[in-house]
Design a protein with these regions (language model features):
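Active-site-proximal alpha-helix that buttresses catalytic centers in soluble enzyme cores
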Residues: 2, 7, 11-74, 115
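Short, glycine/charged-enriched secondary-structure capping and boundary segments
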Residues: 19-22, 67-70, 91-94, 155-159
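Active-site-adjacent alpha-helix immediately C-terminal to a catalytic or transition-state-stabilizing loop
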Residues: 62, 125-176
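Phosphate-handling substructures
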Residues: 70-125
Length: 176
């Protein structure tokens, strides 16, 4: 099997405001753009060789991926299945709001106006299965979102519900 690296998008306006982004687009801040450039530089300096960067269609991930691609010379393309989970009516609300915390407790239930954790798992697991079948020798950098990072980690690692809920990556960090 090939290798995967995961990069979460750079800082966004809603990250700063502690709001739930989900499938709603929130642009990168200037700091987020700087983070993306630094990540591209780190990829080059650390000797990471990848065949392709796949990125979420949301601008925060697309812009991050394109900046990394410019810095590293690695070609990139949009992958629609990497879009963040749709949190429905909870999008743009405070991340630490009581209602959202309660709604998150049921993995099987769909967020009102959004998608369930199971729907997200199916989408991401199918993508990873497809990529694995395409080539055993390619290396990919996936640029997406915190919720997607959690789902990718659960694909490769046996995680308890508590470990899954607690897992997260910082903006523009590189995870293998």
């Amino acid at each position: 099997m090939g290798h995967f690296y995961f990069v979460r998008h750079g800082q966004t306006v809603w990250n700063v405001e502690n709001k739930i982004c989900g499938a709603t687009d929130s642009p990168l801040t200037e700091h987020g753009r700087q983070q993306a450039a630094e990540t591209g530089k780190n990829i080059v300096e650390s000797g990471i060789k990848a065949d392709e960067i796949l990125y979420s269609p949301l601008s925060r991930a697309a812009d991050t991926a394109k900046i990394i691609s410019e810095m590293s010379g690695i070609p990139c393309r949009e992958e629609p299945r990497l879009i963040e989970q749709n949190f429905g009516k909870w999008e743009s609300t405070p991340r630490d709001g009581k209602g959202f915390k309660t709604a998150k407790e049921s993995f099987a239930c769909r967020y009102e106006g959004g998608e369930s954790m199971l729907q997200l798992a199916q989408r991401i697991y199918n993508l990873l299965d497809e990529i694995k079948q395409e080539s055993d020798h390619k290396t990919y950098i996936l640029v997406a979102h915190n919720g997607i990072s959690r789902m990718i980690q659960s694909y490769f690692t046996d995680m308890t519900n508590e470990e899954f809920a607690a897992f997260g990556v910082k903006n523009c960090s590189i995870t293998k």
